[in-house]
Swiss-Prot record:
Organism for this UniProt entry: Shewanella sp. (strain W3-18-1)
Positions bound to iron-sulfur cluster: 44, 108, 110
Domain of life of the native organism: Bacteria
Protein name (database record): Iron-sulfur cluster insertion protein ErpA
GO biological process, any: iron-sulfur cluster assembly
Length: 116
């Protein structure tokens, strides 16, 4: 996919996140799994991000494919994530998937919850 096409996507999926998902799927030996990102009420700032693996893509879900793996977002969550980017980091504090969300007006210290 070209950079211009990537820029038109409502949510981005970084190379680091895609590579980690690919590695996890190889460990699980289940290539049908997809990384599902969702937003739920809760956390110290009002909303929180969730990540899970799912074999299904439901009607209305938005998908992004990179490096042969898929990121899936339900339509309700997507409205809070438009313009965002799902990334993966590994460091002294641990390893995790996270969302860079331009719609978040405040976030908590750990970055797991936000408000709009």
């Amino acid at each position: 996919m070209t950079e211009q096409a990537d820029a038109a996507m409502p949510i981005q999926f970084t190379d680091a996140a895609a590579a980690k998902v690919k590695g996890l799927l190889e460990e699980e030996q289940n290539p049908a799994l997809k990384l599902r990102v969702y937003v739920t009420g809760g956390g110290c700032s009002g909303f929180q991000y969730g990540f899970t693996f799912d074999e299904k893509v439901n009607e209305g879900d938005f998908t992004v494919e990179k490096q042969g793996v898929q990121l899936v977002v339900d339509p309700m969550s997507l409205q809070y994530l438009v313009g965002g980017e799902v990334d993966y980091t590994s460091g002294l504090e641990g390893s995790r998937f996270f969302v860079k969300n331009p719609n978040a007006t405040t976030t908590c210290g750990c970055g797991a919850s936000f408000s709009v």
